[in-house]
Regions:
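Fold-independent oxyanion-binding glycine-rich loops
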Residues: 39-41, 62-64, 76-79
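Alpha-helical support elements that line or immediately flank enzyme active sites
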Residues: 77-104
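Glycine-rich oxoanion-binding loops at beta->alpha junctions
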Residues: 45-67
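Flexible, glycine/charged-enriched surface loops at secondary-structure junctions
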Residues: 105-109
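N-terminal amphipathic/basic leader segments beginning at the initiator methionine
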Residues: 1-49
Length: 110
């Protein structure tokens, strides 16, 4: 997390990319708790992931999904969802599946 940075003076639009926030009910009810990014069809994406052998379920899922076509990126606010046991991968997949359903895209593209 960046420390000591001031607010951006201008946030320039990026063609083929949209960014938004939403309440998914992951945190407190009504709180904006996810960031949703839409990539235009045919976009190329890249990711930089931890090299740590122990990482959160959403990171593991993202590494797999980045091998195919990515249309949406989904991140939760706050701390990582690490150390969640078997429930972690299931919750990560379920959250992506719901966004895919709402967006009308393949689950593997989220």
């Amino acid at each position: 997390m960046a420390v000591g940075l001031g607010p951006l003076s201008t946030l320039h639009p990026v063609p083929g990319f949209e960014l938004g926030i939403a309440s998914a009910g992951i945190k407190r009810p009504g709180r904006k708790d996810v960031v949703v990014m839409r990539c235009a069809e045919g976009s190329s994406v890249a990711g930089v992931f931890t090299l740590n052998a122990f990482c959160a379920a959403p990171v593991t899922l993202a590494k797999q999904r980045f091998l195919g076509e990515v249309r949406y990126l989904l991140t939760n606010t706050g701390n990582a969802n690490a150390g969640t046991g078997e429930a972690g991968p299931a919750a990560a997949a379920q959250t992506c599946a719901k966004l895919a359903e709402l967006a009308g895209v393949a689950e593997t593209s989220v």
